[in-house]
Amino acid sequence: MSFIGEFKEFAMKGNVLDMAVGVVIGTAFGKIVSSLVGDIIMPIVGVITGGVNFTDLKITLKDAAQGVPAVTINYGNFIQTAVDFLIIAFCIFCVIKAINSLKRKPAEPEVAQPAAPAEDIVLLTQIRDLLKK
């Protein structure tokens, strides 16, 4: 099989296509959560904390000089990204937990009852017991 043929076979497998769909949906979900955090949650947290805008929080290491921008550590953006991550991680945890609860546990095989002995065996057992007496 040629290199291109092997690649087509690989690319058309169900797992690869499922993974591609998952990546696209995950990217879209990430954008939604980022918007939720940046546009809804963090402004509310900012109002609660006294009007703090988290995207403006930074430590200036070197001031701007002669057209060179200032060197800063933008820890406010980091806090916002950390909240973003926590929400996504919690959502993934909930989805995995729901999937695991929906999985059916394999039914335990029933223990087979031993078959009743045949009539001639029962009769022979009774004769043996009588002879022992």
Swiss-Prot record:
It holds the Pfam family MscL. The keyword Ligase does not apply. GO terms for cellular component: plasma membrane. Keywords: Cell inner membrane, Cell membrane, Ion channel, Ion transport, Membrane, Transmembrane, Transmembrane helix, Transport. The chain crosses the membrane at residues 10-30, 76-96. It is a multi-pass membrane protein. GO terms for molecular function: mechanosensitive monoatomic ion channel activity. NCBIfam families: mscL, PRK00567.1-4. This is Large-conductance mechanosensitive channel.
